[in-house]
Amino acid sequence: MDDIRKTALDRFRLYLERRQFSAHTIVSYSLDLRLFFTEVAVPLAQVSFREIDRFVDQQHQDGRAWATINRRLNALKHFF
């Protein structure tokens, strides 16, 4: 993960802590974002619905449960 994404993830964790999300949610959302960052190669400022839709499709094809996919989408919603 590059420095920009690492900094963004650190700031996101602080945001979640300030909003008093549970420790479990903070860990889960952080892992979800790391996965998204790994699978989506475009710069953060250029992430669009298309990349998120492809990410969801790939998660579904990989056999992820809809509850997991929806949690990952929720993490992305809070991040962006």
Label the model's feature ranges.
Residues D10-F80:
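N-terminal core-binding DNA-recognition domain of tyrosine recombinases/integrases
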Residues M1-K6:
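A detector for short, charged/polar N-terminal pre-domain segments
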